[in-house]
């Protein structure tokens, strides 16, 4: 089975400042299944990826660790590649954006944009850290919200009232890096003139290159008006210098998508493949990007505009997926559900997760929930109970009674053809990225096979020597039907498929190899292909995740400046009280807010707290916390907030303060 189609497929580049977690794996498993499906069809389908290795967070983390950014990103890249390999995610080339190929391509694209009049210079004002001597990105400034007066809020939005603003609007701003008060400074920046390409983008986004939900979302952004895109950053910065411009660097989001091209360029250079055949604006090949919904703006607006403006082809399609939740909630370090790939691998088989994600992915932008009871049931019932059980039941008789040799004919060719007739529909489901539909169809086929074996009961017939020919025929039929099933599952379960090929003593399975059954064929001794999931292993994984991530949490250690000191009299003005949460409910229309009713012993107060993503309402009711009881009430669009609860945070999670046993509602905190 061969095809003249040529495809290049990419996944979003994982950021090179930390290990992979299960949220990353949703996309990379989704991509890998799709690529394997097409390779089994005989299509030249090349998949590339790499680490996103530039930006301020990497520069600062390397500094914190006392190593160079190059050393940090090289170490993380090895970790990412090791995890991908363990999960059978097989890119044809895995590179890094910190590479000569990427620098050359980024420079070429920038110079072409500049020559075409698409680069605009503007002087902007932004916060500058006088201690670190660097301009501060929005998330590296904190202060008091200018709208609701909530303290310790980031420079781009308030987690309490939901307001968005400029960092320079903050009251009493502080640098997250040094603790110093930032000053405003001017700097000349380079902008890509995105509005020039509005009509091109409107046309491109409405021609089937995106899912309908994404196209509709982009329409909202078009209505709001496209803005020129800042593509430069000031030194110090870890990235590529802008040619001929001292102390200016390309913004990480300029060279990150160019990293797709750079990874493929490296692949081409090593294998003698034509780069231009795939990236020239007249290319007849196909280009597909798999991305998360949080980076659609970059991939569906900036990226195609930048490619078209610099003389390269635009993507055939950008496929977007939703986020991963665990037990219906955002992944949480405190609950142990922020699970790194390596923590999962220490306890569970990687193909359990590949199968589970496949059973839930449907080609839309819906979020995907990992529910561990469902996870156990699907793996144990489907993979072990249905599919593997067919091979183990039939192979035992073939191995022991018939010298490992299958019979010379099928005793139910109609059933064999019935399973084969599902092939085109299964392929279509995989190609359409509706893996859940493919899995349902495959399990329907598995049910038919198990019904056949249960109806014929070879284990009963085997007790009668005169019935051994029937046993031979039934088990030969079962092995051949299993062969069809494992071929259908091969894009999802490549490791199990390889083990099955060895057991079946067959050539690598593909979509066209299963028409002719294995008859009068010697198989090898069966070895268990997959074992049942044990709930204890899931519990151990969650416990490890909670322990390891909590102990390695980044500690906020902001230096205290003399100018920030307050007197004991000032502190005494703050009335801190023990409060019991008697009711909690998420605020509709607010991503982060939870409405709390707090009992202070002799009174109740309503407080809006930015803890919605960290806690479920049910788990808050009845617990004690600490609140600022004498804060001036403030009117928000959701109601009046009469105080503030105290919580700790590290930029990754929020942890509500809770007093020790014996504290009662209304007690003063001294």
Curated annotation (Swiss-Prot):
Cofactor names: Zn(2+)
Keyword Kinase set for record: no
Motif ('HIGH' region): 14-24
Motif interval(s): 'KMSKS' region: 330-334
Binding site for ATP: 333
Keywords: Aminoacyl-tRNA synthetase, ATP-binding, Cytoplasm, Ligase, Metal-binding, Nucleotide-binding, Protein biosynthesis, RNA-binding, tRNA-binding, Zinc
EC number(s) recorded for this UniProt protein: 6.1.1.10
Principal cellular location given in the protein's record: cytoplasm
GO CC aspect terms: cytosol
Segments forming domain tRNA-binding: 570-670
Comment on bound cofactor: Binds 1 zinc ion per subunit.
Residues annotated as transmembrane: none
Catalytic activity: tRNA(Met) + L-methionine + ATP = L-methionyl-tRNA(Met) + AMP + diphosphate
Record GO terms (molecular function): ATP binding; metal ion binding; methionine-tRNA ligase activity; tRNA binding
Pfam families, sorted: Anticodon_3, tRNA-synt_1g, tRNA_bind
One GO term of the biological process aspect: methionyl-tRNA aminoacylation
Residues bound to Zn(2+): 145, 148, 158, 161
Physiological role: Is required not only for elongation of protein synthesis but also for the initiation of all mRNA translation through initiator tRNA(fMet) aminoacylation.
Subunit structure: Homodimer.
HAMAP family (UniProt xref): Met_tRNA_synth_type1
NCBIfam families with a match to the protein in the record: metG, metG_C_term, PRK00133.1
Protein name: Methionine--tRNA ligase
UniProt source species: Legionella pneumophila (strain Lens)
Lineage: Bacteria, Pseudomonadati, Pseudomonadota, Gammaproteobacteria, Legionellales
Gene (UniProt): metG
